[in-house]
């Protein structure tokens, strides 16, 4: 089974100080043996999100921790612990836009939230891991467990 994780889930998984770290680790252990995948969206968003967190006015992430998280992520991709899969850009953007049209009028969803859902669907993910309940609800409607 393919497991697709939202970027914020990966950040919790990779950061010991994160409030959801233990929950993320336990979820990953339950899914051991399945294929955890990443795509271009993760490769773009995760480093940018971590760097942005160093500039927060409240509880900024220290730069050395941010660099460690990015390095751990890169090593997991390079070492094939996280399997890199390509997503068709045109199709994933169209799907994300459709999801926004369907769900974005009822609740707030960011571009990346919708794009991750579209990518997971295009990669035939059976599980979508996220801490965002709104995103998880849509994943469930799309047939993915979470």
Predicted ranges, named:
Residues 1-45, 50-66, 133:
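Short, well-structured N-terminal submotif of metal-dependent ribonuclease cores
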Residues 25, 67-70, 74, 93, ...:
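Hydrophobic core segments within long, regular secondary-structure runs in both alpha-
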Residues 27-37, 76-86, 129:
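Generic detector of contiguous secondary-structure segments
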Residues 31-33, 64-67, 74, 114-115, ...:
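Short, surface-exposed, polar/charged, turn-prone segments marking secondary-structure boundaries
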Residues 52-86:
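Helix-adjacent hinge/juxtasegments
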Residues 79-137:
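Active-site neighborhoods of divalent-metal-dependent phosphate/nucleic-acid chemistry enzymes
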Residues 146:
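C-terminal binding/interaction regions
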């Amino acid at each position: 089974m393919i497991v697709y994780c939202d970027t914020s889930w990966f950040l919790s998984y990779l950061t010991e100080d994160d409030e959801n770290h233990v929950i993320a680790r336990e979820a990953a252990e339950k899914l051991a043996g399945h294929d955890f995948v990443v795509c271009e969206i993760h490769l773009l968003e995760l480093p940018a999100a971590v760097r942005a967190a160093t500039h927060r006015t409240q509880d900024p992430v220290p730069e050395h921790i941010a660099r460690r998280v990015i390095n751990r992520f890169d090593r997991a991709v390079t070492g094939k612990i996280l399997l890199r899969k390509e997503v068709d850009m045109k199709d994933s953007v169209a799907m994300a836009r459709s999801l926004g049209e369907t769900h974005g009028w009822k609740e707030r969803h960011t571009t990346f939230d919708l794009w991750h859902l579209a990518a997971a669907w295009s990669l035939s993910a059976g599980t979508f891991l996220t801490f965002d309940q709104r995103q998880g609800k849509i994943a469930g409607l799309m047939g993915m467990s979470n």
